[in-house]
């Protein structure tokens, strides 16, 4: 479980001091909750996010435990270091919008025919309750030939989960090499 501290002051000066000490600035929020300004050790945060097996993970701040998902993050443009992260509290019975990653498996037939695999959507916005939140969408691209694509409507959805994106948007496809 990831443990963090509550930030008392939210100004620029204190944020810079925390970053200098190896902390990642975070905002934790949900509908009906007061925003929590927190900070986590950067290395601990990265380890937990890489090792997690489900989309939501637990954080502990000020003796309270929250189940959260990463809603947004900011990186430094040159060093690529994490600067800020927004975490959304997952409420089991509250319907909300979440970003779910798309995982590609298999080797497309079109790659052997001089095609290029193009993934246009890395995450899809879904609307569901926290208890129904899928960990990821797994798409098998083995049957895709050149100029074929998988659309949002081709994704098999669990019960009580709907995708907010337009049904005719391509998620992954094989295009011809130029």
Swiss-Prot record:
Signal peptide residue numbers: none
Gene Ontology MF terms in the entry: 5S rRNA binding; structural constituent of ribosome
Name of a matching Pfam family: Ribosomal_L25p
Chaperone keyword on record: no
InterPro entries (UniProt xref): Rbsml_bL25/Gln-tRNA_synth_N (IPR020056), Ribosomal_bL25/Gln-tRNA_synth (IPR011035), Ribosomal_bL25_b-dom (IPR020057), Ribosomal_bL25_C (IPR037121), Ribosomal_bL25_long (IPR001021), Ribosomal_L25_dom (IPR029751), Ribosomal_uL5_bac-type (IPR020930)
UniProt keyword list: Ribonucleoprotein, Ribosomal protein, RNA-binding, rRNA-binding
Disulfide bonds: none
One GO biological process term: translation
Domain of life of the organism encoding this protein: Bacteria
CC per GO annotation: cytosolic large ribosomal subunit
Family: Belongs to the bacterial ribosomal protein bL25 family. CTC subfamily.
Function: This is one of the proteins that binds to the 5S RNA in the ribosome where it forms part of the central protuberance.
Assembly information from the UniProt record: Part of the 50S ribosomal subunit; part of the 5S rRNA/L5/L18/L25 subcomplex. Contacts the 5S rRNA. Binds to the 5S rRNA independently of L5 and L18.
This protein's name: Large ribosomal subunit protein bL25
């Amino acid at each position: 479980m990831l443990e963090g501290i509550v930030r008392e002051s939210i100004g620029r000066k204190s944020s810079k001091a925390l970053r200098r000490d190896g902390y990642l600035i975070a905002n934790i929020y949900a509908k009906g909750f007061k925003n929590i300004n927190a900070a986590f050790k950067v290395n601990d945060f990265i380890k937990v996010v890489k090792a997690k097996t489900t989309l939501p993970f637990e954080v502990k701040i000020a003796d309270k435990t929250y189940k959260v998902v990463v809603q947004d993050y900011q990186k430094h443009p040159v060093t690529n270091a994490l600067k800020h992260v927004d975490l959304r509290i997952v409420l089991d019975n509250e319907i909300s919008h979440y970003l779910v990653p798309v995982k590609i498996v298999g080797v497309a037939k079109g790659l052997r025919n001089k095609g290029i695999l193009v993934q246009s959507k890395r995450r899809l916005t879904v609307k569901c309750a926290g208890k129904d939140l899928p960990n990821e969408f797994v798409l098998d691209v083995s049957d895709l030939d050149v100029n074929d694509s998988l659309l949002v409507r081709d994704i098999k959805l669990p019960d009580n989960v709907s995708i907010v994106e337009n049904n005719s948007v391509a998620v992954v496809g094989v295009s011809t090499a130029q």
